[in-house]
């Protein structure tokens, strides 16, 4: 479980860049250049559009593609656990953060947002509940060592007590994340039912 005050030791350049951004935001807020708040997002799924080369792309792909009736590749074991929120929640996080009083946030300006911590297997079962067995049949397991080496080092669950106390909210389960995608991006209709 990763807490807001967890000592970060990034293992990638991307993680290092994110940490540097958080430190600059905190310092510039402390110095009065602006009143900032850093939003630590969980992995956002289901992202609209086409798959990309990001190591995390499959988290959206194994839901998005089957909902469109297209095959998706699962490059990691179903036992992988990760924390997610929908694009709808991400927008809500940003809007809510913009309205917060800096005094309520305090000197620790970077806040871990809430999300749903689930295994890939749980994601797939949520897809089955929401869209049916035909959608799940479109997921092909094809291990990719390069992606696995990256993903296996990612934190799996986060403590978002502070964010929740400040009024941030996200979905309570992965079914709701899938339903938000269907409502927001597919006009409420599923292609692979």
Predicted regions and their residues:
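NAD(P)-dependent short-chain dehydrogenase/reductase
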Residues: 26-81, 87
């Amino acid at each position: 479980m990763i807490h807001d005050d967890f000592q970060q030791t990034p293992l990638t350049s991307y993680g290092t860049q994110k940490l540097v951004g958080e430190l600059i935001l905190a310092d510039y807020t402390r110095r009065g250049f602006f009143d900032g708040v850093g939003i630590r997002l969980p992995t956002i799924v289901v992202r609209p559009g086409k798959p990309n080369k990001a190591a995390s792309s499959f988290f959206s792909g194994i839901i998005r593609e089957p909902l469109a009736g297209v095959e998706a590749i699962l490059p990691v074991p179903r036992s992988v656990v990760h924390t997610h929120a929908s694009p709808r929640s991400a927008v809500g996080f940003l809007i809510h953060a913009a309205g917060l009083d800096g005094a309520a946030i305090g000197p620790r300006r970077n806040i871990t947002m809430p999300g749903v911590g689930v295994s890939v297997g749980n994601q797939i079962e949520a897809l089955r509940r929401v869209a049916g067995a035909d959608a799940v049949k479109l997921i092909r397991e094809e291990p990719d060592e390069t992606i696995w080496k990256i993903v296996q080092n990612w934190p799996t669950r986060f403590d978002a007590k502070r964010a929740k106390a400040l009024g941030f909210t996200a979905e309570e389960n992965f079914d709701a994340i899938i339903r938000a995608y269907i409502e927001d991006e597919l006009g409420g209709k599923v292609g692979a039912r």
